[in-house]
Amino acid sequence: MAKEKFNRSKPHVNIGTIGHVDHGKTTLTAAITAVLAKKGLSEVKSFDQIDNAPEEKERGITINTAHVEYETETRHYAHVDCPGHADYVKNMVTGAAQMDGAIIVVAATDGPMPQTREHILLARQVNVPKLVVFMNKVDIVDDPEMLELVEMEMRELLDFYQFDGTNTPIIRGSALGGANGDPKWEAKIMELMDAIDNWIPLPQRDIDKSFLMPVEDVFSITGRGTVATGRIETGLVRTGDEVQIIGLDANGKKSVVTGVEMFRKILDEGQAGDNVGLLLRGVDKDEVKRGMVITHPNKVKPHTKVKAEVYILKKEEGGRHTPFHNKYRPQFYVRTLDVTGEITLPEGTEMVMPGDNVTITIELIYPVACNEGLRFAIREGGRTVGAGQITEIIE
């Protein structure tokens, strides 16, 4: 049978399976592909194919992640599953696999365990909007009261981390049964997919957000003016648009785009994902620098103080060999810019060990255009020692 091209007209959503080790995350991922494949909405992926997740390098950090994709009647999903707990922490904190929602898998035989709690906390800290619970292995629990108890504990845990514990769907099923084609458990997998379709919100597409392009390079064309190049992160820009240059010492200088070029062709507009050159009226070459951002006027502010969730690399990952203490001053690589900043640790935290994840406050030495959810790397002498994302703007 010919391979069909994935239908891109359906809205695209990124999700993942999270939860404690051996509770059935990977088996559930395999079961979803098996059940949807019968409806022609997925390709079957076996447990082993998913479990042997390839290594990926994301901002200098190696993470094992398996990616599968499938569709429901209304949506197209990209689904991530990680083999090890450390991979989850790295993935969620660095935003390597951005999640619009997640399936938290909990075994009915155990109930919530330490990593169940830790993954829900991480989901909260990196602003995953909603979770759906899949209570797995219910086929090997004889006592219905046990199932009620696990459900109650999960709802309390969700409430504690400010997910809607009362209304979050909890589906009781058997991932193994679903993967093996037992109709009773296959129906539960479909019930789970319906819950995901209805409970997890559609993300706002990058193109619908306001225009922002980090500057990568700048050059001048004699007789025409200054061109700033970069990859448009969000939104659209058209010839004739008024724009503002932000960050470093730009002081919010305004200009007008007199041309949008891509591969030496003149375009009417550039949109999210395009690598373009913007011809800027009335701007000298030395007024725009790599690391600044170009936006529509008054949409983005430069900031110097933010809160962030970070993962610090282990020695084996090429990170630091020693812990760092309060007031540590590394470089933060934000978009296209390296900027020095000072780290303040949370109260009661003396130091941070390689391999830890921690919430920190960062004070940058000069203002940088940034926003919640923005990812960055932490560097020291040109090598990556950590990564994270901004969770709150302070000033």
Curated annotation (Swiss-Prot):
Binding site for Mg(2+): T26
Segments of this protein annotated with the region G5: 174-176
Cellular component annotations (GO), alphabetically ordered: cytosol
SUPFAM superfamilies noted in UniProt: EF-Tu/eEF-1alpha/eIF2-gamma C-terminal domain, P-loop containing nucleoside triphosphate hydrolases, Translation proteins
Catalysed reactions, semicolon-separated: GTP + H2O = GDP + phosphate + H(+)
Region (G2): 60-64
An example molecular function term from Gene Ontology annotations: translation elongation factor activity
Positions of GTP binding: 19-26, 81-85, 136-139
Main subcellular localisation: cytoplasm
Function according to Swiss-Prot or TrEMBL: GTP hydrolase that promotes the GTP-dependent binding of aminoacyl-tRNA to the A-site of ribosomes during protein biosynthesis.
Protein's UniProt name: Elongation factor Tu
Organism: Azobacteroides pseudotrichonymphae genomovar. CFP2
